[in-house]
Curated annotation (Swiss-Prot):
It holds the Pfam family Flg_hook. The keyword Secreted does not apply. CDD domains: T3SS_Flik_C. Residues 172-209, 350-379 are annotated as: Disordered. This is Flagellar hook-length control protein. Residues 182-197 have a biased composition (Basic and acidic residues). It comes from Salmonella typhimurium (strain LT2 / SGSC1412 / ATCC 700720). Residues 350-369 have a biased composition (Low complexity).
């Protein structure tokens, strides 16, 4: 068993060469000096509360003692600065508290309660809301820069924003904008015109009562002129302008149905049968004139005139082509038979190259030309000729009857 010799060391020897040992600026030295400055024998007691004034007084003493003992002013200067900052902060806090108490004293109890509640909410919000760092602010500014710009509303020319929009506070207060002067002027003008109209109507009625009797046309004209002063009436509609439109509408011919077409070969049995059926259809419909188109367009049309009188039919057909007229003559027996089956007897029929109206027109033209020639000859006969009186007397005679003739 090995026994080590007991080493007797002191506190001063252990901390002599170490920088981490107890120095003059340690907390224990500061407390010891502070206790000595406050009282030599600890007169205040261990449980006594230290005030700011006591700290300032102790700081002044400590600074002097430190300078006298060690000659290093660094610790004393630091202590003095700390005490000065604490004193300034305390003075500012006291000033703020004094002002707040003065403001609270001026408020009513209800307002005081509301103010305290608002201050408590603000303090809680400040505690809960963390302060934004520089990085967060930079990110927010970048996001705002990326947002699209809001379009700026350009006011219309001759129009002010005050005329178009009404402020929200004014609406909440119930302040409505006054009517523009132009609208007031318009209303006053309309009232003035209304008064003029009533005055003119009253004047017209007075004139009618006192003066000579006015015709209804004059009274209507006066009322119309009074109404024109207020507002312009619509354009008058004249009957003369409407009559030509009506006459032109009535003068338009009615749409005529297209003539049926005989598509069968000309002169064939099918063609004769189709022709007879078409004529029978005309008689049933009561048509007095009709047209039939032939299949080759070069053949033209067949004009038919039909007259019915007590189940007696008179038929006239016109075609400019000779072979078409021959085909019509060949179809007459079949047509006569079908009419007889329907109880209609074909009395007179004619087929020609000109219509009956054309024949009448040509005959009337011939008669008029003959009459013109006769009138010319008569005019020539009426011309007075120079003849002896004996010849004129012989031509007239003496009124006696010659019994020997």
């Amino acid at each position: 068993m090995i026994t080590l010799p007991q080493l007797i060391t002191t506190d001063t020897d252990m901390t002599a060469g170490l920088t981490s040992g107890k120095t003059t600026g340690s907390a224990e030295d500061f407390l010891a000096l502070l206790a000595g400055a406050l009282g030599a024998d600890g007169a205040q007691g261990k449980d006594a509360r230290i005030t700011l004034a006591d700290l300032q007084a102790a700081g002044g003493k400590l600074s002097k003692e430190l300078l006298t003992q060690h000659g290093e002013p660094g610790q004393a200067v630091k202590l003095a600065d700390l005490l000065a900052q604490k004193a300034n902060a305390t003075d500012e806090t006291l000033t703020d508290l004094t002002q707040a108490q003065h403001l609270l004293s001026t408020l009513t109890p209800s307002l005081k309660t509301s103010a305290l509640a608002a201050l408590s909410k603000t303090a809680q919000h400040d505690e809960k809301t963390p302060a934004l760092s520089d990085e967060d602010l930079a990110s927010l500014s970048a996001l705002f820069a990326m947002l699209p710009g809001q379009p700026v509303a350009t006011p219309v020319a001759g129009e002010t924003p005050a005329e178009n929009h009404i402020a929200l506070p004014s609406l909440l207060r119930g302040d409505m904008p006054s009517a523009p002067q132009e609208e007031t002027h318009t209303l006053s003008f309309s009232e003035h015109e209304k008064g003029k109209t009533e005055a003119s109507l009253a004047r017209a009625s007075d004139d009618r009562a006192t003066g000579p009797a006015l015709t209804p046309l004059v009274v209507a004209a006066a009322a119309t002129s009074a109404k024109v002063e207020v507002d312009s009436p619509p354009a008058p509609v004249t009957h003369g302008a409407a009559m030509p439109t009506l006459s032109s509408a009535t003068a338009q011919p009615l749409p005529v149905a297209s003539a049926p077409v005989l598509s069968a070969p000309l002169g064939s049995h099918e063609w004769q049968q189709t022709f007879s059926q078409q004529v029978m259809l005309f008689t049933r419909q009561g048509q007095q004139s009709a047209q039939l188109r032939l299949h080759p367009e070069e053949l033209g049309q067949v004009h038919i005139s039909l007259k019915l009188d007590d189940n007696q039919a008179q038929l006239q057909m016109v075609s400019p082509h000779s072979h078409v007229r021959a085909a019509l003559e060949a179809a007459l027996p079949m047509l006569r038979t079908q009419l007889a089956e329907s109880g209609i007897q074909l009395g007179q029929s004619s087929i020609s190259s000109e219509s009956f109206a054309g024949q009448q027109q040509s005959s009337s033209q011939q008669q008029s030309s003959r009459a013109q020639h006769t009138d010319a000859f008569g005019a020539e006969d009426d011309i007075a000729l120079a003849a002896p009186a004996s010849l004129q007397a012989a031509a007239r005679g003496n009124g006696a009857v010659d019994i020997f003739a």
